[in-house]
Amino acid sequence: MTEVLYFLDCYLREFEAIVEKVTDDKYVVLDRTAFYPESGGQPSDTGKLVREEDGAEFEVVYVGKFNGDISHEITPVDGNAALGLKAGDRVRGIIDWDRRYRHMRMHTATHVIANVIEKEAGAQITGNQLGLDKSRVDFSLEAFDRDKFAEYEKIANKVITENHPVNLYLVSRKEAEEKLSRLTTLAKGFSEEISEVRLVEIEGITIEACGGTHLKNTGEIKGIKIEKLQNKGKSNRRMYFTLLD
């Protein structure tokens, strides 16, 4: 099984790895990776793999999880790369940092604003989708008072400027279910194969089960702006927000 490097270090930009297998000359599984695979509403990382033997470069255009494997879809960058990667090759992975860091800001911001909506409005978060320019949060809320969301934005931005530390933990599934009441329900939805749960804690604010990439403190978000609110029928609502740069 691939060692997941971003679970405890989201700021790792480069890493060394060994190719374990290659499918159709372009789907590469490594023994360890810092590339984030698309999941949980967060798009995948991109970047490149550089073969140690000859410096041949391969662009990583997409990363996904298939049948338990983290698969890196590659395309050759130069002539040497046309030979392709094979099992046993040693490579250096390089993350597209601008893209990764933008998603980190978006993801931690999503936890902040979602927590505010839950606490202040009593909403139940039902989904999210991150983007580079804007992200969305879906939630269930019967009394949909749009005017209150300006206040929720202010509360979220106050949390952001307070520079709350963000901590990452890997705990056993049993520990998560026993000690954290909120995770008891969430963990029941996990595959039985999952023995460890990755937790993301914003100190003094919230702790969630989440596999995404996050910042070290809320201050790095800088700020958010709620762009649009939508009524999706019955009690289903949607909110779009952007980052302040």
Swiss-Prot record:
The keyword Zinc applies. Its cofactor is Zn(2+). Keywords: Cytoplasm, Metal-binding, Zinc. It comes from the Archaea. Zn(2+) binds at H107, H111, C210, H214. GO terms for cellular component: cytoplasm. InterPro entries: Ala-tRNA-synth_IIc_core, Ala-tRNA-synth_IIc_N, Alanyl-tRNA_Edit-Domain, Alanyl-tRNA_Editing_Enzymes, Thr/Ala-tRNA-synth_IIc_edit, Transl_B-barrel_sf, tRNA_SAD. It is found in: Cytoplasm. Pfam families: tRNA-synt_2c, tRNA_SAD. Binds 1 zinc ion per subunit. GO terms for molecular function: alanine-tRNA ligase activity; aminoacyl-tRNA deacylase activity; ATP binding; metal ion binding; nucleic acid binding. The keyword Nucleotide-binding does not apply. Signal peptide: none annotated. One of its GO terms (biological process) is alanyl-tRNA aminoacylation. Functions in trans to edit the amino acid moiety from mischarged charged tRNA(Ala). Belongs to the class-II aminoacyl-tRNA synthetase family. Editing domain AlaX-M subfamily. This is Alanyl-tRNA editing protein AlaX-M. It comes from Methanosarcina acetivorans (strain ATCC 35395 / DSM 2834 / JCM 12185 / C2A). The lineage of its organism: Archaea, Methanobacteriati, Methanobacteriota, Stenosarchaea group, Methanomicrobia. The gene is alaXM.
